[in-house]
């Protein structure tokens, strides 16, 4: 049977609805008062003309170009909350040569960092997390052992705007990670993580959709998907399913030694067990999260509150210094193993040729 012929129309980039359209002045500053304020001549105001299909093409062309570009990434970050974006900011500043994809299930990035505790506006960060704010150029009130940002949304919007300006970083929001790509090392017979399985947020496994997903290969995955709740700690929960060891919530996962700075080989996936997050203790929690941020299994770094579910450490409540500095530590951990994991991936299926 002869396949149907595909018909294509030549794209129309733009057309002229108003050939007499001229440049219009909008001045956002005025010293006038008492009814004399005017930022523009609104009687003569008119937007430049555009065809609806031009808008569609402007969006879709760029989005699918990004899908193609980041299908093979150096690093994938799961979750665009405070820890994930802090890591992205640190990675973007230090390695502009790397392709970094951020996957966020929500339409609006930021996680739980748009407010402080109990819907209050101010954000508290214990020192020395103020140094991260200094690097971003963010103002705060210094209260001695801690600092206060006047609104949590100021922190998050500033951080987000800086991350999104990096040309080597792409945020895919409204996109869910529903599984992990694994590789088995023929030399050691151990599995490692080599990418993520993604889908539109409304079509992932939790919706019981039969829609097959898409994939992104990378050398290191950084997971910062948060704690508890139906979408929290996704990667840690999936690792436990991939592991062969029986679940023992009293034992938790093997914690790293914090008395040495020597890079340690992570545990195999087959040994992975969730520790289960403990109750709130601000003083214990923040130190534990930052110090414990690491590559937990080959190819996967876990940071932020997801790590509390892995290690069985305490939650910290409405103090956010550990989220920022766990992101910094995560960026360090990623960069320290990136070349090794890249070499292992290339030995498995060959180097990417794009």
Curated annotation (Swiss-Prot):
Cofactor(s) essential for the protein: Fe cation
Pfam family, one: Thi4
Positions carrying 2,3-didehydroalanine (Cys): 210
Keyword terms of this UniProt record: Cytoplasm, Iron, Metal-binding, NAD, Nucleus, Thiamine biosynthesis, Transferase
Gene Ontology biological process terms, A to Z: thiamine biosynthetic process; thiazole biosynthetic process
Organism superkingdom: Eukaryota
PTMs per UniProt: During the catalytic reaction, a sulfide is transferred from Cys-210 to a reaction intermediate, generating a dehydroalanine residue.
EC numbers: 2.4.2.60
Cofactor note: Binds 1 Fe cation per subunit.
Residues that coordinate or bind substrate: 83, 104-105, 112, 177, 212, 227, 305, 315-317
Subcellular location: Cytoplasm; Nucleus
Signal peptide residue numbers: none
GO molecular function, one term: cysteine-dependent adenosine diphosphate thiazole synthase activity
Membrane-spanning residues: none
Cellular component annotations (GO), alphabetically ordered: cytosol; fungal biofilm matrix; nucleus
InterPro entries per the UniProt record, alphabetical: FAD/NAD-bd_sf, Sti35, Thi4_fam
Predominant location category: cytoplasm
Family assignment from sequence similarity: Belongs to the THI4 family.
Quaternary context: Homooctamer.
HAMAP family linked to this entry: THI4
Protein name according to UniProt: Thiamine thiazole synthase
Organism: Candida albicans (strain SC5314 / ATCC MYA-2876) (Yeast)
